[in-house]
Amino acid sequence: MTNEYLAPFVDELFNLGVREAVFSPGSRSTALAMLFEEYKKYDTYVNIDERSAAFFALGIAKAKKRPVVLVCTSGSAAAHHFPAVLEAKMSRVPLIILTADRPAELQFVGAPQTVDQTRFFGNFVNHFENLEAPHIQKQSQTENFWTYPRKVAQRAVLSAISPLSGPVQINVPLRDLLVPELKSENYEKGRSKHAFKFYEGQAQVILPFDEALLSGKTLILAGANFDKDYSEALLKLAEQLKAPILADPLSNLRNHNHPLVIDSYDAFLANNDLKTQLKADAILLFGQMPVSKRLQQFVAFNNEAEFIQVDPALDYRNPSLTTTTMVQSDVLPFASSIKKVNSDSSYLEKWQNAQEKMRQLLEKVTYEESPFEGRYVQELQKHLEALDAQLLVSNSMEIRDIDYWWKKADAKVRILGNRGVNGIDGTESTALGIATTGKPTVLLTGDLSMLHDLNGLIVGKTHELNLTIVLFNNDGGGIFHHLAQKGVPNFDYLFSTPHGLNFAGLAELTGLDYHLVSGYADFGQQFEASLHQSGIHLLEIKTDKDLSLALHQKYTTYEN
């Protein structure tokens, strides 16, 4: 399967309207040239000089006003494309340049016809991407071998024509054997049930969705967003469609005790029988994909659904590789364009019933006496939901604790997080930046995140900012107890990383008001007091990683 994955790439480009391919002869680009030619539907052209070939392709694209593929071998060949790439960029002509390349193991070792082709054309392309051979570890990943190259093709075409037309470079590292197996059936592999579509602007957003939305099995995924208009628009849309909204905690839709808002889904989507019952015909994604890994797995499992991503920037935000339609629109105009439909309510009821059953189990944690993050999150919500406050949640385990235990309720508190790249760095600094608004501000963080940004506390003292820090201290990386690394050799040393540091001493060093929480009642008293006092307050809650894992499993196992 050395280069068979390129056949779906060739097929997808054609499906998206590409009709011409221009080649210059070369060994490393053999598979690309042969697969385009064997497809039989492209108008193909061969030009022995890469510079001339590039301008020839430019002329086709300029005249026909659509993307044209330009293929070259590795080494200096791409350099001869540069003048035409510059012209395409400045005159906004769509070109898709496929630069064949040597694989990683032949880079920087003196292999012939090998230069660093990463971002070869610099800022003069709209988009750059490597099309690597997909790696398959197990049978369940075979589908991605054929789906992934189609997604690269979709991004290439989309970037070549939107928002402004221009050139795109797709670098294609290829290993021997370079001559492909020409199997006609490979072109069809990885095709979605729904042809990929994208819509620029806001005028046509309703057109591709009527049939799927009318089926009644429509699911809305609400990713991170902190605007009030976002929540109101999605609630309006859900009411029109009678569709459940799976609300990420950072969507702030859990501030609405609305029957269409679904929480606790990360827990019950672990049940395979229920997952099958909840499969949708259409999935609408707003914002980035929610934090729940089980939800992402559900989306991949639900790969025959029409997956519609609504985003003003047309950014790909679906790591499950199942997006079938992209709509360039903000939430409000999209929601306003959808007309009220008569849909079957049974699909919605399945989600509501699953949530209710899960809620009954999760609420039993209120009787838990052991120090457990789940109950402390519920206690935190109880004290915050009536306030016009701001809660920043650190990454790693804390955002997942919020995802599990923060239930929907009519509230004002805004939940924020740094989910762009999901790092644990800069947490205290971000919280103090948020605190400059003057509203009551709380940071929920873990011990490693806290240690990562101790220097950030200095600005809070300098500028006399007010912040309450709720610290879950399990002496290391507790998230790894929930992941595949649990139990591997040297687990504590490599992953759990117990540090044994004294946060009382660190608080004294940084000038924080410190309190070691002795129980749930004590937490409530100290937390309320901190909100009415100036300065930075640190409430440390000590937990045990193994006990937390056991309690998490106890309270989140959904059974039929």
UniProtKB/Swiss-Prot annotation:
Keywords assigned by UniProt, alphabetized: Magnesium, Manganese, Menaquinone biosynthesis, Metal-binding, Thiamine pyrophosphate, Transferase
SUPFAM superfamilies: DHS-like NAD/FAD-binding domain, Thiamin diphosphate-binding fold (THDP-binding)
Catalytic activity: isochorismate + 2-oxoglutarate + H(+) = 5-enolpyruvoyl-6-hydroxy-2-succinyl-cyclohex-3-ene-1-carboxylate + CO2
Cofactor note: Binds 1 thiamine pyrophosphate per subunit.
InterPro entries, A to Z: DHS-like_NAD/FAD-binding_dom, MenaQ_synth_MenD, MenD_middle, THDP-binding, Thiamin_PyroP_enz_TPP-bd_dom, TPP_enzyme_TPP-bd
UniProt KW Manganese keyword: yes
GO MF annotations, alphabetized: 2-succinyl-5-enolpyruvyl-6-hydroxy-3-cyclohexene-1-carboxylic-acid synthase activity; magnesium ion binding; manganese ion binding; thiamine pyrophosphate binding
EC number: 2.2.1.9
Disulfide bonds: none
Cofactor dependence: Mg(2+); Mn(2+); thiamine diphosphate
Associated pathway: Quinol/quinone metabolism; 1,4-dihydroxy-2-naphthoate biosynthesis; 1,4-dihydroxy-2-naphthoate from chorismate: step 2/7; Quinol/quinone metabolism; menaquinone biosynthesis
Pfam family membership, one: TPP_enzyme_C
Keyword Acetylation: no
GO-annotated biological processes: menaquinone biosynthetic process
Quaternary structure and partners: Homodimer.
Family: Belongs to the TPP enzyme family. MenD subfamily.
HAMAP family: MenD (MF_01659)
NCBIfam families named in the record: menD
Known role: Catalyzes the thiamine diphosphate-dependent decarboxylation of 2-oxoglutarate and the subsequent addition of the resulting succinic semialdehyde-thiamine pyrophosphate anion to isochorismate to yield 2-succinyl-5-enolpyruvyl-6-hydroxy-3-cyclohexene-1-carboxylate (SEPHCHC).
Name of the protein this chain belongs to: 2-succinyl-5-enolpyruvyl-6-hydroxy-3-cyclohexene-1-carboxylate synthase
Annotated gene: menD
